[in-house]
């Protein structure tokens, strides 16, 4: 890449589905600041992570559409004339999918098909970047996990992400809609929802520490994960979008530095200077769902795209806490119903170990 990354997007049109969510809003802000003409598509479904305040830094610089990716007429209209489509909308909670799989099937699978079919009909020259999940692999058979590893997802959410990825791959291969397929590991940082424990373990642990609450650490704390700061993730998304060699490829986005959960928790508490933790026993149900150790092989995206994460865990946690300290009211603020949900989440088993 011979010029500044942001310069590739100056004056370009970019559609971000799920653009008021955690990663989508950070991406939209980066694009707007780079001079792109940004369109947001977000249905703002309750408890799915969307937050209008996420876009506060660029609220007058982006075009926001409150609609669902399953609305064919809206999607058909919005994809027209876009240079880039960053597809991040979806139901993103593993635990919710265990008791109600239909949003995953409807939003993640059908919604993705609607987006891709709209592009085929009305804008086949657009470049697509899709963000899936490392959960598509299921339990790892060797480490670090590369893109050739078998995919044996353990839940409906992960199955829906894998299916959406395969749908997009077909449109790339058959209909020549240039697409990049990313499998994200454990992403953390500013602008995540912080009202309940269902989305992302690292951010939820940050909330518990900031509230000076006790974090439950299941097992012996030795389970390994890789954690990637959201700004690094956005950088991977943008770099892959402008790299021709990346089109049609699958890439892991994470860190090749595995971190035991105990180290994660201790880092959060040390940086926050509050909070505590204790060991807890796995319930039989949680133990059956736990995939065990996971950390990514990111050598492929480094080779093709030139991307590596640059934010250390300690620095990323510090930036995350600094953000929520400054903007707490917009993420902790609750209705009476949400207040009960948060208290229940604090009393329930710890956040899903993504």
Model region roles, listed by residue range:
Residues 27, 33, 67, 210-354:
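C-terminal substrate-binding subdomain of Rossmann-fold SDR/epimerase-dehydratase oxidoreductases
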Residues 97, 149, 179-194, 204-228, ...:
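A conserved pocket-lining segment of Rossmann-fold NAD(P)-dependent short-chain dehydrogenase/reductase
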Residues 52, 203, 234-238:
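Short alpha-helix within the catalytic core of nucleotide-sugar-dependent glycosyltransferases
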Residues 163, 167, 171, 201, ...:
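Hydrophobic alpha-helix immediately C-terminal to the catalytic Tyr-X-X-X-Lys motif of short-chain
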Residues 46, 193, 197-201, 260:
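Short acidic-hydrophobic sequence patches enriched in Asp/Glu that either
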Residues 99-100, 142, 156, 192-197, ...:
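Short, solvent-exposed loop/turn segments at secondary-structure boundaries
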Residues 1-187, 326-327, 336-348, 352-354:
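N-terminal Rossmann-like NAD(P)+-binding domain of SDR-like oxidoreductases, especially those catalyzing
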Residues 147, 158, 196-199, 295:
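Short, conserved loop/turn and helix-capping segments at secondary-structure boundaries
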């Amino acid at each position: 890449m011979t010029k500044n990354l942001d310069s590739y997007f100056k004056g370009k049109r970019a559609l971000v589905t799920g653009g008021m969510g955690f990663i989508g809003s950070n991406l939209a802000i980066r694009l707007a600041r780079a001079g792109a003409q940004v369109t947001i598509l977000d249905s703002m479904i309750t408890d799915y992570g969307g937050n209008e305040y996420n876009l506060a830094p660029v609220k007058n610089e982006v075009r926001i559409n409150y609609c669902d990716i399953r609305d064919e007429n809206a999607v058909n209209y919005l994809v027209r004339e876009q240079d880039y489509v960053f597809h991040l909308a979806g139901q993103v909670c593993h635990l919710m999918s265990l008791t109600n799989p239909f949003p995953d099937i409807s939003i993640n699978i059908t919604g993705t098909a609607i987006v891709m079919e709209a592009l085929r009909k009305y804008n086949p020259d657009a470049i697509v970047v899709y963000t899936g999940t490392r959960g598509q692999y299921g339990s790892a058979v060797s480490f670090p996990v590369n893109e050739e590893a078998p995919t044996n997802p353990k839940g409906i959410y992960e199955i829906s992400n894998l299916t959406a990825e395969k749908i997009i791959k077909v449109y790339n291969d058959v209909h020549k809609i240039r697409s990049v397929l990313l499998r994200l590991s454990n992403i953390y940082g500013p602008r995540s929802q912080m009202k309940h424990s269902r989305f992302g373990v690292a951010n939820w642990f940050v909330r518990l520490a900031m509230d000076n609450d006790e974090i439950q650490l299941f097992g012996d704390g030795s389970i390994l994960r890789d954690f990637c700061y959201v700004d690094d993730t956005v950088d991977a998304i943008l770099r892959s979008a402008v790299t021709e060699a990346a089109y049609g490829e699958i890439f892991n986005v994470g860190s090749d530095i595995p971190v035991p959960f105990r180290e994660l928790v201790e880092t959060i508490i040390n940086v926050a200077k509050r909070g505590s933790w204790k060991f807890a026993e796995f319930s039989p149900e949680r133990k059956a769902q736990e995939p065990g150790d996971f950390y990514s092989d990111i050598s492929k995206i480094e080779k093709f795209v030139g991307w590596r994460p640059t934010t250390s865990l300690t620095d990323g946690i510090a930036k995350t806490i600094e953000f929520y300290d400054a903007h707490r009211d917009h993420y902790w603020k609750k209705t009476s119903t949400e207040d009960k949900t948060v208290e229940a989440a604090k009393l329930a088993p710890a956040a899903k170990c993504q």
